[in-house]
């Protein structure tokens, strides 16, 4: 019977060692998963910062070009207004004279379709 109890005792010890090894492997696996998760988070943060930097750079280029465009449009508008004011001042006198002469200087004429009934 002692040999049987020794065999059972050896089996229990082997089972305990296997259980300890499994627990140790689970702990190592958990530690590796935690480390991998931390590394992934660091990598994600770095990637996010890189993409944010690229986005801000592109945004500043676009916004800068929009500011340049708005300044250019403002300059063109002011130039056009000055040009129109110049034309107004230049031609105002002659246009008013033509308009007044058309209204005031009437030349009475008989219409071409008028027929004398006499």
Swiss-Prot record:
The keyword Lipoprotein does not apply. Residues 5-54 form a coiled coil. GO terms for cellular component: cytosol; plasma membrane; synaptic vesicle membrane; vacuolar proton-transporting V-type ATPase, V1 domain. Residues 14-26 have a biased composition (Basic and acidic residues). Keywords: Coiled coil, Hydrogen ion transport, Ion transport, Transport. Kidney. Disulfide bonds: none annotated. Residues 1-34 are annotated as: Disordered. GO terms for molecular function: ATP hydrolysis activity; ATPase binding; proton-transporting ATPase activity, rotational mechanism. It comes from the Eukaryota. GO terms for biological process: synaptic vesicle lumen acidification. V-ATPase is a heteromultimeric enzyme made up of two complexes: the ATP-hydrolytic V1 complex and the proton translocation V0 complex. The V1 complex consists of three catalytic AB heterodimers that form a heterohexamer, three peripheral stalks each consisting of EG heterodimers, one central rotor including subunits D and F, and the regulatory subunits C and H. The proton translocation complex V0 consists of the proton transport subunit a, a ring of proteolipid subunits c9c'', rotary subunit d, subunits e and f, and the accessory subunits ATP6AP1/Ac45 and ATP6AP2/PRR. Belongs to the V-ATPase G subunit family. Subunit of the V1 complex of vacuolar(H+)-ATPase (V-ATPase), a multisubunit enzyme composed of a peripheral complex (V1) that hydrolyzes ATP and a membrane integral complex (V0) that translocates protons. V-ATPase is responsible for acidifying and maintaining the pH of intracellular compartments and in some cell types, is targeted to the plasma membrane, where it is responsible for acidifying the extracellular environment. This is V-type proton ATPase subunit G 3. It comes from Homo sapiens (Human).
